Amino acid sequence: MKKLQRTLALVLASIILCLAFTSCSNTGKSIMTKTYTKSATESDGLNLASSATYITQDGKTKKSFSLKGKHEEIKYITVDFGDSVDFNTVVFGEAGKKVTLFEIYGSNEQDANYQFLYQSDCIEGGHTCFLGDVKYRYLRVFVNQSSGNYNVNSFEAYYLKNEKAKDLRVNAYFIAEDIKEDADFSNLDALTDVIVFGTAKFDGQGNIKFYDNDSNEVDEQYYADKVNLLKSKIGDRKINIITDIAMPYGDDNLDIKSMMNEQNVDNLVANIVDFVNKYGFDGYDMDYEFPEDKEDWKRFNNFLRKLDKAMPDKIISLAIAPWDLRFDDDVIKAIDRVEVMLYDMFTAHGYHSIFSTTVNGVNKAIKGGFSPEQIDLGLPFYSRPTNRLGYWGNYNQFGGKIDRYTNLIYFNDFDHDGNPMTAPQYINSVQMVADKTAFAIDAGLGGMMIWHYSCDLPYDDELSLFKAITDTKTAKQK
């Protein structure tokens, strides 16, 4: 499995990314501003906050939004739109990164009958809160928990719909080993694309070999049976099937350098094309996340040019970490999709994949040359512990402990090496997934990417994350 094969690399990457992605940077804030200015214009919507007044906890009325408090001081502010108005989206900004729990309530009376609407944890540089269609005159915004003195300094409210919401890609990695007759295939109803990952693996010459979950080499029929079973379960659903042949990661990635060098690259490309055609795949995805130097990037760009020329009518997809991108301009045009991995990136609180790191990562991918339409926003359907150790827990293992809003799960278990593990687990809840999906639509992104398919609850469960994506797409449509 990808996560087990690459534990060390991910832990090291998390340390690096923690320094770069712990909050929504100024560039991240700029994409939030651009997104909601553009979305409001296209939806004939207005920032309802522009004409609102704000009532402080002690009854004073202000023209601007500001919610400040001391460490662990619970405070609220009331937003008065002046009349009962329709809206579905609230956007907050914070100066700093101290808020760890906030809530939104709505009412048509200033001081009575407030209904709970929303809860989440971090705001930092920016947080889109997707509420669904609601209609209220008053909102009351609470900060319930913080790790220090806080300052929530911006508030926007919109009613945003988009006819393109229905076209948002939903692309999930499906680990080949997990394709079994007794697996849950109900979440296929949410998907437009699947990427079959693993079992097939490159060697240092670009040849393809096959391995089971215990790393034993097996006959190709073992892989073929998995693919055929998946195709039978997909049936007549309109789902693209893309293959991802596992990379030969190792010390200094010497086998990757070898398979892309001038001696082997043509063999590599030919083997990919033959493999894609043999199984009738709709495209090819490469999970080469960490080219290390100028020569690595030169080889990678050269390979992608050759691959695009060899299979121009197939989807070319790349899993990327959104930093230090050095794709040549012509190569960027040849890439159909980038699966932007916006997870395993920790805040100072030890939370991975919060909303603002997602915004920052998307912005970095755009700054790296990709158009929004090429970008699939990466979602983790798994947990990471707040102590950042190498443990990945499937979302569906927390049954009975999860609800729509809570991202922080208190869960005692053993890590992958059998050691006791007591640190809280951070997940992306149904609401967090809805928020990120709404943002992807508002920002004009091409789609969502999920690592990985088998982590979710069944599609008919009210806490299914795939269902959260579908429901948000539906709610955002004009």
Predicted regions and their residues:
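Active-site groove signature of glycoside hydrolases
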Residues: 269-297, 341-344, 449
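Glycan-recognition patch characteristic of GH18 chitinases/ENGases
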Residues: 162-272
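Aromatic, loop-rich ligand-recognition surfaces of beta-strand-rich domains
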Residues: 27, 60-114, 123-164
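Substrate-binding surface in catalytic domains of secreted glycosidases
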Residues: 171-172, 204-222, 290-404
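Glycan-binding loop/region signatures in secreted carbohydrate-active enzymes
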Residues: 374-439, 459, 465-478
